[in-house]
Structure formats: structure tokens, C-alpha cells
Amino acid sequence: MALPNKFFLWFCCFAWLCFPISLDSLPSRGEAQIVARTALESEAETWSLLNHLGGRHRPGLLSPLLKVLYDGHGEPPRLQPDDRALRYMKRLYKAYATKEGTPKSNRRHLYNTVRLFTPCAQHKQAPGDLAAGTFPSVDLLFNLDRVTVVEHLFKSVLLYTFNNSISFPFPVKCICNLVIKEPEFSSKTLPRAPYSFTYNSQFEFRKKYKWMEIDVTAPLEPLVASHKRNIHMSVNFTCAKDQLQHPSARDSLFNMTLLVAPSLLLYLNDTSAQAFHRWHSLHPKRKPSQGPDQRRELSAYPVGEEAAEGVRSSRHRRDQESVSSELKKPLVPASANLSEYFKQFLFPQNECELHDFRLSFSQLKWDNWIVAPHKYNPRYCKGDCPRAVGHRYGSPVHTMVQNIIHEKLDSSVPRPSCVPAKYSPLSVLAIEPDGSIAYKEYEDMIATKCTCR
């Protein structure tokens, strides 16, 4: 008997390995969550499990974020950004996102990506003439390989960040002279006249600064739109010389232009499907060329929150009442307690609802390049769907019809499943392989509402 027992045990293990757990079946989902909590102790085991949870059965649970982030896993050590630039981006993240990592609803910007680049090369040029109010110019080269073709520029600034605040005793008016130069070409390319574009921006220094931004959108917009990988620019400041007589004002500007290399900050709109598009959240109900008849027709089929509010036409309300009455007919013994019946079938104990799935990027050993958020809770839906689903779940009439088919006609037709009905986006601040810093907003990353379908 020992040999058949061993063979049976081997066969069960082999079958378990060959047929992955389906997240669409309720018992296996519960088992998968138990395994997930114990597997977080090991990075390899954790990724294997999370990859399974974010696979073809449940693409919305952990993908696309973990899949996108894992693409860089195992690369050589990443370049670390400048501390001042990192502090600035952390401050930007706090202004744009909550502690849970969701974009703040009171923000009205239409971009979903902010990239900060530090110069990959820096050279001093003309020494300048402080007596005439002209400060030394600096030659800068920025590499924009991380900007993708689906990212469109909204705004670009030169960012000066300081360890200590610089102060000015009185306002100082200056002009930033920016010269965009064409990169040098190899001898194999056809010779052409050198290209340069000069851009002047006027601004005024006031009081204390921990950072300073100079808008350079106009000269950079055509270069980013044409997907230029390298941007070569020369920057210098010219200030009114009569306002530089005060030593503190002159020293502050001198330290800023010589001791601090500016970063390039790009505000972009990622148009890919996995990015969060804030315009749709600001105008969720706007549809092109929609007449009154179309609006009435659409309102008859509400989903998500609209269905939860009970926005239905009278015709569908009558359909639901007739189906509900049909559901109440079958097989209720005369001696049965109606309250127990409704408790068992209409409101099951393991009711469909949201559950937490908390993970930490430090457990995945990704916290050295995922700066924020520190923790991620995608949440998931689990539980039994009641036989007569009402407005609370926002389920369509088809869900009730499916229940009737399962119970009366064909048991092979599955019962409605407990699935997410609504999601919220997630904001992520990460260090890229080249040492640049990226703030990105990902769509549909946190389940916020469950339904039965």
C-alpha cells in the first residue's frame, strides 16, 4: 500500500503544479491570499506570487504597475540623483498625492508625469563681468532618453535647488539668457549650418529661496515634440548692475550660478492606456455629439456608482421587479423561517466586499528606487454574491438572469462573480536607471468598489 500512496501523493503535487490556481474561483482566491502573506518573506517567492496574481486571470490586481516596475529588476546599480533634486521631487509628491499614494482630488493639472533630469555634462564658458551685472555662463547637456513617444510636453523649467536658502535684501531684476545648440554630428553625417536658438526670460528675485524655477517651455517644446534625445544649452544671467551693489545680493547670485547646476524639469502627459488621465476624471459624463435620445438610452444602463444610486428607467425597474419575484418563488418549505431564508440567500455571511492586500516595497527590496509610496494596498473583491442582487451592488439585470439560469436550467453556468467595479489611480515616485527622477500616475491601481457580475 505504501507504493500506491506515494504515487497518489506525487500525482496530486504534479497536478497542482501544472494547473495554476484560478483566481476566479472563490475558495482558491482565499488560499492564494493566505499563501501571499507568508511568501512576502522571500523576494523571489514574493515576485512569483505577485506575478501570478497580476497575470492573465486578474490583470487589474497588481498590473500594470508591478509589471512595469519589475521590467527594471535585476539591472546594474542605478545612478543616484542629487540630494537637492530628490528633496524637491519628494515635496512635489506630497503636494500631488495622499499618504496612501492616490492623486489628490483638488489638483487640477492635466499632466500625469513629471520628470527631473540632471545634466550629464557641465562646462564653464565665459567668465562674466560682475561689474556689468553679467554672471558666468554654463554649458549644459541633458539626456532625455527616458521620455517616451507617448509623453507630450506641457511645461518645462530650469530648476535651481539649494541646500540653504538664498536671500536678497531687496528685489533684483534679471534676465536669463538661454541658448539652445544643435548637438555635434559625426563626420559621417551630411554637413549643415550650425543651429542655435536664443531665448530670454525676465524674472525678479525676492526675499528667500530654497529653489528657483525658470520657464523654458517655448524653446524646448519643439525639441521634445521631435523626440530629441540630447539637449545642449548655454545659460547665463544678466542683472541690473545698480541692484548688485549690495554684497549679499551679488554673492547670492554668484553662488547660485556657479555652485549649483540646474536640473531640467519636464511636465508631461502620458497618453498610454496604463497612465491616469485626469481630464476624464474632471469630465466623466461628457460624450461627443450626444443627443437627448442617446442620453436617455445611456441612463437606462447605469454601471458603477450611477447604478448604486438607482438611476434606472421605469422599464428596467419593471424588469427587475418581475425577475426578483421569480427568484422568490423556488423551493421555500412552508415550515422554513423566512428571516433565516433571506439571511442565507439574500445576504450571505461571506458577502461580496472589499478586502485589503497590503505590501511594502521594502519587502520586495525595491525601496532603493521606488521613493514613494512606501506601501501599496491594491485591495481585492471577495465573497458570495446574493441570489437577488439589488441597487447596492450596481449589478445589471443580466446578473439576476444568470442566477436563474444557474439554479433552474443549467448548473454548469457559473453564478455571478464578485469583482471590482471601480478603481482609483496610484501616484509613484521612482528613480530611473539613468539617475533621473520620475513622478507618474497609474490608472486603475486600487480597487474601491465591488459588484456582482
From Swiss-Prot:
Cystines in this chain: 352-418, 381-450, 385-452
Disordered as annotated region, ranges: 282-328
Residues modified by glycosylation: 163, 236, 255, 269, 337
A Pfam short name: TGF_beta
Signal peptide: 1-27
Biased composition (Basic and acidic residues): 318-328
Modification comment: Phosphorylated; phosphorylation is critical for GDF9 function.
Positions of the pro-segment in this chain: 28-318
Main subcellular localisation: secreted
Localisation per UniProt entry: Secreted
GO CC terms, sorted: extracellular space
GO molecular function, one term: growth factor activity
Record keywords, A-Z: Cleavage on pair of basic residues, Cytokine, Disulfide bond, Glycoprotein, Growth factor, Phosphoprotein, Secreted, Signal
Subunit details: Homodimer or heterodimer (Potential). But, in contrast to other members of this family, cannot be disulfide-linked.
Miscellaneous: Ovarian physiology and fertility are controlled by endocrine and paracrine signals. These act in a species-dependent manner and determine the ovulation quota in different mammalian species. While humans, and mammals such as the cow or red deer, normally ovulate only one egg per cycle, other mammals such as mouse and pig can ovulate in excess of ten per cycle. The mechanisms that regulate the species-specific differences in the number of follicles that go onto ovulate during each reproductive cycle are poorly understood.
Family per record: Belongs to the TGF-beta family.
Annotated function: Required for ovarian folliculogenesis.
Protein name: Growth/differentiation factor 9
